[in-house]
Amino acid sequence: MPSENLRWETLEALKNSPKGKLKYSPDWVEKGEDVLAGCVEVPSLSPLSGQILKRMSPRMLLKNCSRSSSVRDTSPGLSEEAAVCRSAPISPRLKRSSCSLPAVSIQTEEEEEKEEEEKAEVVVEAPAVSPEASVSTPPAVSVLSPRATQISGCIRMCEQKHKAKAKMELSLRQEQQERLVATVANHESEQLKRFEEFMELKQRQEHQSIRDTNEKEAQESLGRQEKLREEHRHRMKILNLRLREMEQQRLREVELERQRQVEGRERHRAINAIQEEVLQLNRLLQPQQSTHAEVEHAPYITRGNQLCSQLSEVVPAAADDQFPSVEDLSVAERALQEMRSLVRSLQEAVSQAAERKKKKEQEEEEEKRRQEQLKAQQEEQKKSAALSAKEKAKKEGLQTGADDSTLKWYNSLQDLANQCAQAFDDLNKAKDTQTKKLKMELQKAATTPVSQIANSSGAPLKEAFEKIDKLLSRRPVTSAGKTVSTSQHPQGLEFASYRLAEKFVKQGEEEVASNHSAAFPIGAVASGIWELHPKIGDLILAHLHKKCPYAVPHYPPMESGTSVEDYQKILGYRVDEGKVEGQDSFLKRMSGMIRLYAAIIQMRWPYSSKQGLHLHGMNHGWRWMAQILNMEPLADITATILFDFLEVCGNALMKQYRVQFWKLILIINEEYFPRYLCFASILHFTCIHWLQNIE
């Protein structure tokens, strides 16, 4: 089929032509560009155009030219293209490039294929043209057939279809992109939701973890608390057990203490009974008128006195609010057994002497018996005469109280103390805090050095003395880390003086009563302060006389209208809520104050620079001894204070008064003791024996 071949050759030639190589752009119409703007080459005939013209008939060529002339005015561009297409030969190169043209819609539609076939047939059936004719024709003939116009229209329709298709594809692409964007957005939103859900899950997990941790910690805390409660309950059980054991131990100790006190009281009563029996047996050792002269009683008496002294050392220790121990009781029992054996041996010696005497003087027994009777009568007469003389002396010489001058001196000292107390009454009753604080500091500064004396000596004793002297001299004193002076208040000196004197007497009442050796350092400091500040000495005497009237000496009588409790207070007893202190405690306190008074009388401050006599020296001690012996003795107290005074101050009195002192001792032994023995209790024979040993 030659027409079919020509069609394909034509198409190949069109494809290979410059216009067939135009690049399609859908923006030509919108931008107003020319379709052939890309082809600027001058149209020229192909070398093969001659062969084509030869094969075409002249009739067809003229027909085509007429068609082209009719259509030239309407579409000159297309006629030129058609002419070029007809005149251009079809080469294999154009066949190969035809596949690249964008004419897909022409090949797909049947009408376009038919038009192409008809065009190809026209080109093939054209008669051959001679070279001369081809040369004579104009070189650029523009032939535009209706078919070309149709093709051009088809091309434009194809372009429009392509544009519509492109628009449709673009809209589809946009829809696809929108769907893709929506899908991506949905996916991202889902991802965001999943992420938020993941974050919420993670947050819930964290919260759950925190909650679990808190619950675990709470459980652990509850466990620890329960453990602590259990430990607390366990400790409480242990403490309760310990408290129960301590309470049982305390009850056992109380029971043991009660038993100890019961046993101690029993031992105390036993020792008292033993002492009473020993003293009675000691009386049996004394030589009697009926005893034979050949028997020497001196060794027995000496040993009996030693046993009494040994026993008396046990009794005072038991009297100081303590109970005698089993060893003390055993010592007392051994002393009693020895005293009994001593009495038995004495009785045996007396009986043996009597037997010897009977053997030697059997012949003179009756005569000696008469002589003994006569001698006994004479002794009785002497005793009655001595008793009558003593009764007469009692009626004429001894006093029951202090004389008027002594009472006047006693009252003046009490008035001085009362005036001093009234002088600092405002300071004593002050209510403001500053004044109260000053009062307490002054009291500490006055009493603390006295409390520190005790058994001290040397530098500590001198330091205490200097502190007291500075305080009374209105100089500043450091006490408990604070500086205080009596000049800080107008009544400070009177207050400090009164409290200082009161503290000295209290030390004698308590410290000296328990520790007899403390009387000498305290007495030395008090004597030195007395020399520098005489008013302190008067206040010390006033406080001493008030607490111990026997230091005057004075036995206050019971006046009418005075109750028993008040009278006991006047005598020096302590009365607390109607309960009077025991006799042993009373004698112990009186002994301490008398010892302090005796120490003050004989002691001098060793560092004193003053010369001269003591303001209250040994002459007052001699006066006290004389006055106490001129007064009727009182049971217990007289022997106690007389012994304490002589034990502390006796040596000093002996050195100063010598013979007169020994005369005084003889009077005590020969006249005072017999009077005292008439009413003294057996328990206080110890003091009498001590006084006898002084002789």
UniProtKB/Swiss-Prot annotation:
Where is the region Disordered?
203-226, 354-400
State a single Pfam family of this protein.
GLE1
Superkingdom of origin: Eukaryota
Q: Name one GO cellular component term.
A: nuclear pore cytoplasmic filaments
Q: Which GO terms describe its biological process?
A: epithelial cilium movement involved in determination of left/right asymmetry; neuron development; poly(A)+ mRNA export from nucleus; protein transport; regulation of cilium beat frequency involved in ciliary motility; retina layer formation; Schwann cell development; Schwann cell differentiation
Coiled-coil annotation: which residues?
105-126, 216-255, 326-433
Which keywords describe this protein according to UniProt? Coiled coil, Cytoplasm, mRNA transport, Nuclear pore complex, Nucleus, Protein transport, Translocation, Transport
Question: Where mainly found?
Answer: nucleus
InterPro entries xrefs: GLE1, GLE1-like_sf
**Which residue intervals are annotated with compositional bias (Basic and acidic residues) in the record?**
367-397
Location relative to the cell: Nucleus; Cytoplasm; Nucleus, Nuclear pore complex
GO molecular function terms here? inositol hexakisphosphate binding; phospholipid binding; translation initiation factor binding
Subunit structure, interactors included: May associate with the NPC.
Q: What exactly does this protein do?
A: Required for the export of mRNAs containing poly(A) tails from the nucleus into the cytoplasm. May be involved in the terminal step of the mRNA transport through the nuclear pore complex (NPC).
What this protein is called in its record is mRNA export factor GLE1
- In its UniProt entry, the species of origin is given as Danio rerio
